[in-house]
C-alpha cells in the first residue's frame, strides 16, 4: 500500500505555516483498488461515520478547504470506478500525487495532504448487514400509479445496467431488482448519486435524479473463504 495510512488513524498534513516540500514527481491516479483490513470488523454504517468524521474535521486542522473538497470528490469518483473524473478533479485543483494514490497528495503551494485508507476503499472484513430499513420499507405503490422509466446504473466493474424504475421506488427495491437481473446480492451493493450514499429507504424522487443521469453502484463482494 506504499505510503497509505492503512491503520484506523490519520496523520495530519503538514501545517500551512511549515509546508513540506512537494515531491518532484507527479504520477497519474492508479486504477487499482487499495486493499486493507480493519483492526476490528466494522459495518457499512460505521465506515460511513468514520468517513464523515474525517471529512468534517480535516479542513479545520490545516490545509486549504477547496483542496479538501476536491480530494473528497476525487475519492468518491475513484471508489465509484470513475477514474477519468477523479483525475480531472485532481488536475483542475493542481493536486499532485507522488505515488499515484490519494494517500499522499500535495497542492501547488507544497502543502501535504494525507487521506486515511478507510476514505478510499472499504476493508476486506466489512460486515455485510441487513438493516431494519428493509423490513420498515414502505410498500410499493399500486401498479396503476407507477410511471416507469429506464434507470441507468453503473457498476464498479464498469458494466452499465438499465433498470425499470419509477420515482416512488426506494433504493432497497431497486437493489433487489438489480439482484434479480445480475445476481448481485443487495447487501453487496452501495448506491451513490452526486457523491452521496443512498440508503435503502431513499426514494428516487428524493434524489432529484433527472433523465440520462447515472447512479454509481459499488459492489463489495466478500472474499471467498480460505481453506
Swiss-Prot record:
It comes from the Eukaryota. Residues 149-224 form the Ubiquitin-like domain. Residues 1-35 are annotated as: Disordered. Residues 24-35 have a biased composition (Basic and acidic residues). InterPro entries: DC-UbP/UBTD2_N, DC-UbP/UBTD2_N_sf, Ubiquitin-like_dom, Ubiquitin-like_domsf, Ubiquitin_dom, UBTD1/2. Induction: Induced by cytotoxic agents, it is also increased during premature senescence. the induction seems to be mediated by TP53. May be involved in the regulation of cellular senescence through a positive feedback loop with TP53. Is a TP53 downstream target gene that increases the stability of TP53 protein by promoting the ubiquitination and degradation of MDM2. Interacts with UBTD1. This is Ubiquitin domain-containing protein 1. The gene is UBTD1.
Amino acid at each position: 500500500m506504499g505510503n497509505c495510512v492503512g491503520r484506523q488513524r490519520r496523520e495530519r498534513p503538514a501545517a500551512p505555516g511549515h509546508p513540506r516540500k512537494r515531491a518532484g514527481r507527479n504520477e497519474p491516479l492508479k486504477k487499482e483498488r487499495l486493499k486493507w483490513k480493519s483492526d476490528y470488523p466494522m459495518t457499512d454504517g460505521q465506515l460511513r461515520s468514520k468517513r464523515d468524521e474525517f471529512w468534517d474535521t480535516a479542513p479545520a486542522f490545516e490545509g486549504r478547504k477547496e483542496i479538501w473538497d476536491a480530494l473528497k470528490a476525487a475519492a468518491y469518483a475513484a471508489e465509484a470506478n470513475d477514474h477519468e473524473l477523479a483525475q480531472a478533479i485532481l488536475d483542475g485543483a493542481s493536486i499532485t500525487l507522488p505515488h499515484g494514490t490519494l494517500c499522499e497528495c500535495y497542492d501547488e503551494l507544497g502543502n501535504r495532504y494525507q487521506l486515511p485508507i478507510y476514505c478510499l476503499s472499504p476493508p476486506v472484513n466489512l460486515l455485510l448487514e441487513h438493516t431494519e430499513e428493509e423490513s420498515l420499507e414502505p410498500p410499493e405503490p399500486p401498479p396503476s400509479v407507477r410511471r416507469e422509466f429506464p434507470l441507468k446504473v453503473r457498476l464498479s466493474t464498469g458494466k452499465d445496467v438499465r433498470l425499470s424504475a419509477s420515482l416512488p421506488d426506494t433504493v432497497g427495491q431497486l437493489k433487489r431488482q438489480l439482484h434479480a437481473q445480475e445476481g448481485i446480492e443487495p447487501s453487496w451493493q452501495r448506491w451513490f448519486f452526486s457523491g452521496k450514499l443512498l440508503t435503502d429507504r431513499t426514494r428516487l424522487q428524493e434524489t432529484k435524479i433527472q433523465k440520462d443521469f447515472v447512479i454509481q453502484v459499488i459492489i463489495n463482494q466478500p472474499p471467498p473463504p480460505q481453506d
